[in-house]
Amino acid sequence: MPGKHSDSATSELCEKCKENISILVVRAKPICHDCFARYVHTKAIKRLESFRVNFAASPDQQRKILLPLSHGVSSTTLLHILDLHLNTQRSKTNRTGFAISVLVVDEGSLDPARLDKVRERYANHDYASLPLHDVFRLLPDDASLRAFLPESQVQEVCSTQEQLTSLIASLTSATARADVLTTLRTRLIVEHAKQTGCESILWGDSTTRLAEKTLAETAKGRGFSLPWQISDGKSPFDINFHYPLRDVLKKELFSYVDLAEPALSALVYEPQSGATQASMSSKNTTIDDLMKQYFESVEENFPSIVSNVVRTTGKLEVPTGATSNPRCSLCGMPVPDGRFGIHGWGGDQHGGADDAAAVSGGSLCYGCTRSIPQRGTAVASK
């Protein structure tokens, strides 16, 4: 079957090296252990050509990159591959192309022992753990976030933890809560990277995850931001985004975790690919959950479909001068022509930009307006 991926062991010779017995059938090709490990490693490292060792630079002027670690299969695998890559560079040249700073965002249920295990395995890197509510503290002007708090708390002096709890509790749907949490997490990661001198963020998103994000962000009304959320390059936040695992399926990463030496399974806290089940209650089902379930099922037998979604989306280009557009106060993305709020994109005769501009610090893009309708309605009606 075209594009089929199977974990079933076979007695065939590896199609790549023609020497060893294959242990996996990956994208219709039987592959042995060594060739599969090399396949995943090469897919990631070829995306990092710009991070080669710079012999012209002083050793104390090493570039620094941030790796957000969720303890999932993708970010854990990326850390493992980068660690191997740096060790290889160090053994050959006594230098490395970059230094890794690992950030874990604590959303309230983080077990510190997880990070301790990672730090023990990969001891040559810097590590930090920040609570998600620190986003209210780290952003240069937290007034833009405070504008979305319930009115009863806007005038009060609340802790950052109370502000986050109040904001999330005020949202009316599971999709809205998941969307705002993801948005705040990204803002926190970006701000930490900038404040610690990182020039790039290496996201662990796999092909499968990028495909999920493509359809989810489009469905939520934030499709205009896809060139920045899917492709490698300069982000609107004046820091580079890279997706080294963009050519590797999530299912392949789970296979890699099991076959890596030493095994990575003890460091990964995520259900096996394909195990995601949408909630039986539509009230508790998010758009992200549905997209995750869909693409994890598709990649089982038709990985080419998943790859085509990402490949096609990757062709989208950022319009000239887009970064000079007004920004959404929540997600921070440049909004085309400042068309804020529901009316800005609704196809009706109401103006979005002028109405939204009336509220200081509260201008929301269409997607964020859908997640925070109370504030979005207020913005559009002023």
Swiss-Prot record:
GO terms for molecular function: nucleotidyltransferase activity; sulfurtransferase activity; tRNA binding. Its main location: cytoplasm. The keyword Mitochondrion does not apply. Keywords: Cytoplasm, tRNA processing. Pathway: tRNA modification; 5-methoxycarbonylmethyl-2-thiouridine-tRNA biosynthesis. One of its GO terms (biological process) is tRNA wobble position uridine thiolation. GO terms for cellular component: cytosol. It is found in: Cytoplasm. It comes from the Eukaryota. HAMAP family: CTU2 (MF_03054). Belongs to the CTU2/NCS2 family. Plays a central role in 2-thiolation of mcm(5)S(2)U at tRNA wobble positions of tRNA(Lys), tRNA(Glu) and tRNA(Gln). May act by forming a heterodimer with NCS6 that ligates sulfur from thiocarboxylated URM1 onto the uridine of tRNAs at wobble position. Prior mcm(5) tRNA modification by the elongator complex is required for 2-thiolation. May also be involved in protein urmylation. This is Cytoplasmic tRNA 2-thiolation protein 2. It comes from Phaeosphaeria nodorum (strain SN15 / ATCC MYA-4574 / FGSC 10173) (Glume blotch fungus).
